[in-house]
Regions:
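Central regulatory/effector-binding core of bacterial HTH transcription factors
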Residues: 1-45, 106, 113
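Structural detector for helix-capping/boundary residues
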Residues: 19-22, 31, 55, 76, ...
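Generic preference for hydrophobic
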Residues: 16, 35-37, 49, 59-60, ...
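Beta-alpha-beta core module
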Residues: 45-56, 70-71, 77, 117-168
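C-terminal effector-binding regulatory domain of bacterial HTH transcription factors
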Residues: 7-9, 134-145, 154-198
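Well-formed, non-transmembrane alpha-helical positions, independent of function
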Residues: 4, 26-27, 51, 77, ...
Length: 198
């Protein structure tokens, strides 16, 4: 959505930085950042938070995995499975760990990725299975990749995204317009399973 945001908000100078959500939140409160886009939860005291969308998580398996050819994967199929995740400093690690507890699976502690790209490559190499966000899947995984991407039947797996800014920021009206614009642009991202939040 960034090119379209740049076209619509030419007066806005965006500097994109990636970081751990807790650090982004702290930097926002400390006025190092004016605005953050992050997954929920975001600590709310002193911040205005505008929910954007709900993003499903997809189960990703190597093609030689025992479940790769199963038409429908159920939660019981994942009992005892070892799941790859990123290192524990990321909120995503906690989300995947909680999901694994719900499914009766475990997270692998001997191999942890440093990014979603690393997780994808680890699955391609047959090191295990993982869960990846649908936006990442839509933008980075190709039909030619030796992976099976699927849902887990009967399990609601997702993460919520929001924009946040300091509640006293003089740019509040601009940030609210920006949040609405992102909601308008999300359907064109290619991830058809996102749900808008308001």
């Amino acid at each position: 959505v960034l090119p379209e945001i740049h076209d619509r908000f030419q007066e806005l100078r965006l500097f994109v930085r990636e970081g751990v959500p807790a650090e982004l939140n702290q930097d926002l409160r400390g006025a190092k950042h004016d605005l953050i886009l992050s997954t929920q939860p975001i600590a709310e005291a002193g911040l205005e938070i505008s929910p954007l969308f709900r993003e499903p998580l997809k189960l990703v398996l190597p093609l030689d995995h025992r479940l790769a050819n199963k038409e429908v994967i159920n939660r019981t199929d994942l009992v005892g499975e070892e799941v790859l995740t990123i290192d524990e400093h990321h909120l995503y690690h906690r989300q995947v760990t909680e999901l694994c507890q719900t499914l009766g699976a475990t997270t692998r502690r001997d191999f942890e990725g440093t990014s979603l790209d690393t997780l994808r490559q680890m699955v391609v190499m047959g090191m295990g299975i993982t869960f990846l966000p649908s936006l990442y899947v839509a933008s980075e995984i190709r039909d030619s990749d030796p992976l099976r991407v699927t849902d887990v039947f009967g399990v609601n797996m997702y993460r919520d995204h929001a924009l946040a800014w300091r509640s006293r920021s003089p740019a509040r009206p601009l940030f609210r317009r920006l949040a609405q614009t992102i909601r308008e642009l999300v359907p064109a991202t290619g991830a058809s399973d996102l749900r808008l939040l308001y």
